[in-house]
Amino acid sequence: MKDLPGMPGTPGGLGLRVLQLLFAAISLAVMSSTADFASVSAFCYLITTTVLQCVWSLTVAIVDIYALLVKRCLRNRRAVTLFSIGDGITWLVSLSGACAAAGITVLIDADLIMCSENPCASFQTAVAMGFMCCFSLLPSFLLNFYSIASSHG
């Protein structure tokens, strides 16, 4: 396996995990703070995906911290494959949650013009943080996937 910055067990990898956790936690907190998120299934789905993202990122961040503290290499084929599959699934689920919530937010804001009755700024912030979470997860997935693909041949 190639030693790339951002791979599991590196400071760059830990930094990406912390960013993922931060963006997901902000999205979760902002959306949960709105009174009427439970009435819209797309907003509930965004909350579910951000909880999944928080759990995944926190777990992998703890593994990264442990690997950095004991100076253990996490770049073996089995571990990187596990991280790549987890990152890929989590990325797709998080992206679908952010897209679904974005669609409803645009509907409420631009099409129905109901922002006076709804906390549109909170919805938009939660959706933006959901997308930022996805964008910060993508490098982790791509680096792990590239590492697997390049070591196979």
UniProtKB/Swiss-Prot annotation:
In this UniProt entry, which residues form the Cytoplasmic topological domain(s)? 1-10, 71-87, 147-153
Q: Does the keyword ATP-binding apply?
A: no
Q: Which GO terms describe its cellular component?
A: membrane; plasma membrane
Q: Which domain of life is it from?
A: Eukaryota
Q: Where are the transmembrane segments?
A: 11-31, 50-70, 88-108, 126-146
Q: Does the keyword Transmembrane apply?
A: yes
> Where's it found, cell-wise?
Cell membrane
- Give the UniProt keywords, A-Z: Cell membrane, Membrane, Transmembrane, Transmembrane helix
Q: Return any one Pfam family short name.
A: CASP_dom
Q: Give residue spans on the Extracellular membrane side.
A: 32-49, 109-125
Membrane topology, as annotated: Multi-pass membrane protein
The UniProt entry's sequence similarity note says: Belongs to the Casparian strip membrane proteins (CASP) family.
Q: How does it assemble?
A: Homodimer and heterodimers.
Annotated protein name in UniProt: CASP-like protein 16
